[in-house]
């Protein structure tokens, strides 16, 4: 076991706070509409320029081990807020720094750190109640665009694209952000249910110019196992031929005699047919096939259910308005499944999302939910250079996360005003223990920190802005740092998601209170490098 170095009391806290300040000062310059960018050197490739707080925080590693402990703790604030709300990381960092600074002063004045923490916790709980009470539901596409615009650093085009994406795929739809090869930022929406399996043979293609299979009003055979022989398939093929409609076969695999027969039928023009592999593997494949069956009003042909392929009738096949298959993807549009069955399946997947502890499983379940309930949208971010595209993608990611948070828990006046207004509720708290009361006062002061920083970044005196807002009785009155004027924030479209504000305060207080109660630091001493052995004769040649 390697030797350790230990620091105590004031010396330990001073070093921790130095680390907190270094990280916080680098992050907080990005706050607000007039926040600046941070340029980050990368060990390989071009440097990265960003205005995203958590990206800056993750890049900071300090040489002094004690200071680095403080920076790492503050980085946790940004990371946790990003994980839970997806935005508000800079606000959380500014709040944490303010609580740490005031808390350290109180501890230096011989107040009890544990009582201070109790006071901080009481005040934060009261502030969160006030924020939740002020939140109002997002009611229009315009409000969704406003949230996106603010989080994307007042980029109205980004807000508009996100609002369009949400409108098209719904609240349960999946929206992803990718880098584009062009200069423009575009929105690509996939209607219906899409899975990543293409046609098994190019002979199935119906549109030879675009190499696509396109069917109108097809039947869909959903089979869980491999199809290799022709005999079990014949009754289904004969029944479908009588209707004159196309047939899509989805199975674990289609090969040998079965595939050859389907291809020959297609080429001779007797039956419009195509075959694709089932998506996923194992239990996940079973679940996805069941999703397709429910969406199309069909039945999964499975030995587990005792259904034999040779006994399948037309009523057990799924149906859809349209199907489009390319080399890599299959898209089913307008499935004819019953609404109550689809709603029941959606409710079941939602329950699984709530219960799962695995991030990977949650992501896959959300994809299935999106495919059943709305669709998938892809925002392709364009720009002139790689650096510009990456910077813009950071802002679009933030805006998208903020929009989801706003839909989940509603919106509050932005620009740090929701936190400032929460002071009124917190100031009513009283406690006979003076140290706990001091903890409440720490939070009261910290609640002003974000709005002061937004004003400072805009070149305006923060204390004047705070004073003017508190003088006005209107809960939506605030400071528009972009135009440097006082406005009704809701009318001006300057709003924040309540979830982002709440999470930022919770996470900031949680870590900051732990730093305040820290009394000793333990770090590993650097190991001395052994001297290299003397070079032998002739080593210079």
UniProtKB/Swiss-Prot annotation:
GO terms for cellular component: cytoplasm. This is Chaperonin GroEL 2. Disulfide bonds: none annotated. Its main location: cytoplasm. CDD domains: GroEL. It is an enzyme of class 5 (isomerase). It comes from Bradyrhizobium sp. (strain BTAi1 / ATCC BAA-1182). Together with its co-chaperonin GroES, plays an essential role in assisting protein folding. The GroEL-GroES system forms a nano-cage that allows encapsulation of the non-native substrate proteins and provides a physical environment optimized to promote and accelerate protein folding. Forms a cylinder of 14 subunits composed of two heptameric rings stacked back-to-back. Interacts with the co-chaperonin GroES. It catalyses: ATP + H2O + a folded polypeptide = ADP + phosphate + an unfolded polypeptide. The gene is groEL2. Its EC number is 5.6.1.7. One of its GO terms (biological process) is protein refolding. ATP binds at residues 30-33, 51, 87-91, 415, 496. Belongs to the chaperonin (HSP60) family. It is found in: Cytoplasm. NCBIfam families: GroEL, PRK00013.1, PRK12849.1, PRK12850.1, PRK12851.1.
């Amino acid at each position: 076991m390697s030797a350790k170095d230990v620091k105590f009391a004031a010396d330990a806290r001073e070093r921790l706070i130095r680390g907190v300040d270094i990280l916080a000062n680098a992050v907080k310059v990005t706050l607000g509409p007039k926040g600046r960018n941070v340029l980050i050197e990368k060990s390989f490739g071009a440097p990265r320029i960003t205005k995203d707080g958590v990206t800056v925080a993750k890049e900071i590693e300090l040489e002094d081990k004690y200071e680095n402990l403080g920076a790492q703790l503050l980085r946790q604030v940004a990371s946790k807020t990003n994980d839970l709300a997806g935005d508000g990381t800079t606000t959380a960092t500014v709040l944490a720094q303010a609580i740490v600074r005031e808390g350290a002063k109180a501890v230096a004045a011989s107040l009890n750190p544990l009582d201070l923490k109790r006071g901080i916790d009481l005040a934060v709980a009261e502030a969160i109640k006030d924020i939740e009470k002020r939140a109002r539901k997002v009611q229009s596409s315009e409000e969704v665009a406003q949230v996106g615009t603010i989080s994307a650093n007042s980029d109205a085009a980004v807000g508009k694209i996100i609002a369009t994406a949400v409108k098209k795929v719904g609240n349960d739809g999946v929206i992803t952000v990718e880098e584009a090869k062009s200069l423009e930022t575009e929105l690509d929406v996939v209607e219906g249910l899409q899975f990543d399996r293409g046609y098994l043979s190019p002979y199935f293609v119906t549109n030879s110019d675009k190499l696509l299979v396109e069917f109108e009003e097809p039947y869909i055979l959903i089979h869980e196992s491999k199809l290799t022989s022709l005999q079990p398939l014949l009754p289904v093929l004969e029944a479908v031929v009588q209707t004159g409609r196309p047939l899509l076969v989805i199975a674990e695999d289609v090969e040998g005699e079965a595939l050859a027969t389907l291809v020959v039928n297609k080429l001779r023009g007797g039956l419009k047919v195509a075959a694709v592999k089932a998506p996923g593997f194992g239990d996940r494949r079973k679940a996805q096939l069941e999703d397709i069956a429910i969406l199309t009003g069909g039945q999964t042909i499975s030995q587990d259910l005792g259904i034999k392929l040779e006994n399948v009738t037309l009523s057990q096949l799924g149906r859809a308005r349209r199907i489009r298959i390319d080399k890599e993807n299959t898209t089913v549009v307008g499935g004819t499944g019953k609404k109550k069955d689809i709603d029941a399946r959606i409710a079941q997947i939602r329950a699984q999302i709530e219960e799962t502890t695995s991030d990977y499983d949650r992501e896959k379940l959300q994809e299935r939910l999106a495919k059943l309930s709305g669709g998938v949208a892809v925002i392709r971010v364009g720009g002139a250079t790689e650096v510009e595209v990456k910077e813009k993608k950071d802002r679009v990611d933030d805006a998208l996360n903020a929009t989801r948070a706003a839909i989940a828990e509603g919106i509050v006046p932005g620009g740090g005003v929701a936190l400032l207004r929460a002071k009124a509720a917190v100031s009513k708290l009283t406690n006979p223990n003076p140290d706990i009361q001091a903890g409440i006062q720490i939070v009261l002061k910290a609640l002003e920190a974000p709005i002061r920083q937004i004003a400072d970044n805009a070149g305006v005196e923060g204390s004047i802005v705070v004073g003017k807002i508190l003088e006005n009785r209107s809960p939506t009155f605030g400071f528009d740092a972009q135009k440097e004027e006082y406005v009704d924030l809701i009318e001006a479209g300057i709003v924040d998601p309540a979830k982002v504000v709440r999470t930022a305060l919770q996470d900031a207080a949680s870590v900051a209170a732990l730093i305040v109660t820290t009394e000793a630091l333990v770090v590993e001493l650097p190991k001395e490098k052994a001297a290299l052995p003397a070079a032998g004769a002739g080593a210079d040649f």
